[in-house]
Amino acid sequence: TTLFRSSLFGIQYPIIQGGMVWCSGWRLASAVSNAGGLGLLGAGSMHPETLREHIRKCRAATDRPFGVNIPLMYPQIEEIMAIVAEEGVKIVFTSAGNPKAWTGWLHERGIIVAHVVSSSRFAVKCEEAGVDAVVAEGFEAGGHNGREETTTFCLIPAVRNATTLPLIAAGGIGTGEGIFAAMVLGAEGVQIGTRFALTDESSASPVFKEYCLSLGEGDTKLLLKKLAPTRLVRNNFRDAVEKAEDSGASAEELRTLLGRGRAKKGIFEGDLEEGELEIGQVSAIVSRQQS
């Protein structure tokens, strides 16, 4: 933990709150940072100017370090990166893309870069790209996942053996015991999504939170593998996806079924039947909403 406290993120505890779409706004990120962890804003569901507003509000609410999570496949990536630099953000977590694309640019502006990977092969690519830390995420995680379907328990030692980069474990971690287990396996810190998505400060719909707190084992499933493998909660939309996949739907047909704004509809607006409900397997052991 010394590494996280002193040289890397300047935080008190080696706990990072995942920058999740529709959950990770300034209220959540600043609360986590104020508590001694690292809060991340989820740029994936924000228009560029919305992100600017959240960065400013987060900075007003905390004097501790915080960062921004940016999926590299974001359509207005240049605008988002420019805003992050203009607003003086010092920590960026990137995912869903090649870390080579932006790491150098971010480093030139004095920004620390961590990249999310789902395999040791990608972790090696991160090291080659010059990132400062790697987040190894097992497929227990909610939302988008890697194609390898490797569990966190198997992924952490594999990544630890493949790279000397500071290693952050993610996927299926939601308790103190889970954090300890990740560190025993070789991680220096953890990134937690689900547990923070279901807090008071999360910007997700109260209806979505309440529903996810009632889930048990087996209530989430990895689907949409022809597009980007995504862990989804059972509902009408997921049933339709499963039916389409079972009948051999093409990537194009699945894209049409997915449409636009499906995750917003589910997570932010609380449409439990037609929305895309993304949450991790660890939701099965989270039963109450906390601050």
Where are the predicted features?
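Alpha/beta enzyme core
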Residues: 23-35, 53-63, 74-168, 175-194
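Short catalytic-loop micro-motif centered on adjacent basic/acidic residues
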Residues: 16, 40-42, 67-69, 91-94, ...
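Conserved active-site-proximal phosphate/metal-binding subdomains
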Residues: 146-168, 174-290
